[in-house]
A protein has these predicted regions:
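Intrinsic-disorder/low-complexity coil detector
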Residues: 6-10, 16, 44, 80, ...
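Acidic, metal-coordinating catalytic segment for phosphate/diphosphate chemistry
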Residues: 2-31
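Nudix hydrolase/Nudix homology domain
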Residues: 46-58, 90-183
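Conserved Nudix-box catalytic region and its N-terminal flanking loop in Nudix hydrolases
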Residues: 2, 29-95, 118-130
Length: 183
């Protein structure tokens, strides 16, 4: 029991100076969520892509959880989610883009002038070097990465496997990257 007369104990760890002394400011990166909505039509993956943008981007309020914002976004389009999963991030035009794949039930219809049904094309993965990201990352490359990620999750994560049984034949075509060399 301490009497208060003892000298202060030596610190367990000596902390260095702060990494940054800049509070939030316009010089810091902002973030946005990219919601890549996929569904199945005629046993093939289809991307529900915004008609007037390269991808669906929404803001991320400081108090919100990203997955909840994605679910709210899907609700605005009256889409029924089956799987929502963060898949990647990238730095783009002064902001961090956090990408989520959202697999939804095939919609009977879509609100006019919002989302277009676009067949999913295969793409080479974006490659950087050992200490730097790729110089450019396209949305189709993000979708390719996401589908390879789902290919692994559908086998490894029971919740994903149960949610996407009809996607298994499609996802077999997308070999997870960490395991390509082992095949």
């Amino acid at each position: 029991m301490s009497t208060g007369d003892e000298p202060p104990a030596e610190p367990v760890v000596e902390l260095g100076p702060p990494i940054s002394e800049v509070a939030w400011s316009p010089e810091l990166s902002t973030q946005s969520l990219e919601v890549l909505i996929l569904t199945l039509e005629d046993a093939e993956p289809v991307w529900l892509k915004p008609e007037h943008a390269d991808s669906l981007r929404v803001g991320l309020p400081a108090t919100a959880r990203p997955g909840d914002v994605v679910l709210d976004t899907l609700g605005r389009y009256t889409l029924t989610p089956r799987v929502v999963h963060s898949t990647s991030w990238r730095h783009e035009e002064g902001r961090v883009v956090l990408s989520y794949i959202a697999v939804v039930e095939p919609p009977s219809g879509l609100p006019e002038d919002t989302l277009a049904r676009t067949p999913v094309a295969r793409a080479d993965l974006a490659r950087g070097d050992a200490t730097a990201p790729p110089p450019e990352i396209g949305v189709l490359q993000v979708i390719e990465h996401a589908l390879r990620h789902l290919s692994w999750l559908v086998q490894d994560d029971p919740a994903i496997g149960e949610a996407l049984p009809d996607w298994r034949p499609i996802l077999e075509r997308y070999q997870p990257e960490p395991f390509r060399a082992l095949g």
